[in-house]
C-alpha cells in the first residue's frame, strides 16, 4: 500500500514500471490503454429506496441492483487487496461549507498523480472522516458480464447512498473525476441546495462573473480564457 506518495516519487515509479515516459518538455506522458474516453454505456447508479425517487432514471442514469453492486464490490476489494495499490486522501469542493473528503484507491502511480492534480490537496491529519470512496480496479475484467446482465466487461458504478464509486476494467482517469462530480451532482443540490454546473467561468475587473455552458469539446475552456478577465475554472463549478 502506497499512501500519499509525493509526485516526484510517483513519476519515478511510473517510468520504472514502463507505464509512462517524459516528453521533451519534461511532462509525464502515459497511455490509458484501449479507453481514451469515458464509457457512458457502462455507467450505472445503484437504485435503492433513497435514490429511487431522486435520480432521473433512463439511458444516461441506468439502474443497478444493490445485490449486483455488492457482488462487484466484493470482487473489486478482493482484487485490490491482492495487488499493489496507491491510496490518496483529497478533497472535492473548495468551499469549507461544502467540502467533501475523498479517498481514492488506484492501481497505477499515473492515476494517483491525476488524483493529486485534479482534486484539492489538504492536510490529511485534518480530515476526520471520509465522505466518498473511489475504488479503481483498472486491470480487473468482468468475464461473466453477459450472465450478470452487463453490456461489457468494464463498468463504473456509483452507490450514492453508501458514498462508494467502483471503476472496473478501464484505466481512463477521467472516470475518477467524473465519478465524484456525478456524486456531487446528486449530493449538493439534494443536501445543500447548491447547483452543480458543468461549465467554465471567469470574472471581470468589476467583479462580474460569466459562465460558459456546453458539452465536452464545444469551447468552454477556450471562451473562458480571456486576456481581459481572470479565469475561475474551466470545467466544474457550484
Identify the residue ranges that each predicted region occupies.
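Glycine-rich phosphate-binding P-loop
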Residues: 203-234
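Conserved nucleotide-state-sensing and coupling region of NTP-binding domains
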Residues: 238
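A noncatalytic interaction/capping subdomain that flanks phosphate/NTP-handling catalytic cores
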Residues: 1-209
Amino acid at each position: 500500500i502506497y499512501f500519499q506518495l509525493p509526485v516526484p516519487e510517483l513519476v519515478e515509479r511510473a517510468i520504472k514500471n514502463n507505464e509512462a515516459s517524459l516528453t521533451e518538455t519534461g511532462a509525464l506522458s502515459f497511455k490509458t490503454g484501449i479507453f481514451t474516453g469515458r464509457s457512458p454505456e457502462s455507467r450505472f447508479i445503484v437504485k435503492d429506496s433513497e435514490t429511487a425517487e431522486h435520480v432521473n432514471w433512463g439511458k444516461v442514469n441506468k439502474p443497478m441492483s444493490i445485490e449486483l453492486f455488492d457482488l462487484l464490490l466484493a470482487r473489486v476489494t478482493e482484487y485490490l487487496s491482492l495487488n499493489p495499490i496507491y491510496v490518496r486522501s483529497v478533497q472535492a469542493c473548495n468551499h469549507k461549507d461544502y467540502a467533501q473528503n475523498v479517498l481514492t484507491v488506484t492501481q497505477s502511480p499515473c492515476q494517483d498523480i491525476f488524483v493529486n492534480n485534479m482534486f484539492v490537496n489538504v492536510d490529511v491529519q485534518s480530515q476526520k472522516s471520509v465522505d466518498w470512496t473511489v475504488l479503481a480496479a483498472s486491470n480487473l475484467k468482468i468475464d461473466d458480464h453477459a450472465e450478470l446482465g452487463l453490456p461489457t466487461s468494464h463498468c463504473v458504478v456509483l452507490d450514492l447512498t453508501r458514498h462508494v464509486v467502483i471503476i472496473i476494467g478501464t484505466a481512463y482517469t477521467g472516470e475518477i473525476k467524473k465519478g465524484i462530480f456525478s456524486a456531487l451532482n446528486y449530493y449538493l443540490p439534494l443536501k445543500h441546495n447548491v447547483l452543480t454546473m458543468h461549465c467554465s467561468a471567469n470574472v471581470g475587473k468589476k467583479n462580474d462573473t460569466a459562465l460558459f455552458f456546453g458539452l465536452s469539446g464545444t469551447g468552454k475552456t477556450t471562451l473562458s480564457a480571456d486576456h481581459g478577465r481572470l479565469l475561475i475554472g474551466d470545467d466544474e463549478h457550484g
